[in-house]
Amino acid sequence: MNKELLTKPFKKEQIKNREGRQGMIYYYITISDVIDRINQACDSVQIIVKEKEIYESEVIVLITLNLDGETKESFGSSMINGSIGDALKSAHSDALKKAAWLFGVPCIFNTTTEPEIDNGQGNVGFRCSV
């Protein structure tokens, strides 16, 4: 596992944002960028869906992420706003990002200000708790 690559801040163009409730701006990294980072930094990647629960208005997924023999688990959830399949996909992405964050991938931001980014000079990116 290349820990330096795994924990490297993402480039500014990789940090997306969307408007949420009450006009708040949420910053995020796409799941494809998170998966690309994991695949580049690790020789062996295994993702296992251990549990999934479908409720009336929400789905919850528990995944295990194994990177080069080291394992982390995380839950993800999503409201059902359309199809159950879309909600499961969203919950899986949520769980995978949270598990990746446990390995040090800087992919979760709990802030209302723009996160710090990689400026090419070795600055450490913004990280926070889930």
State the predicted function of each range:
Residues 1-28:
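N-terminal, Lys/Arg- and Ser/Thr-rich interaction peptides
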Residues 130:
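Accessory terminal regions of nucleic-acid processing enzymes
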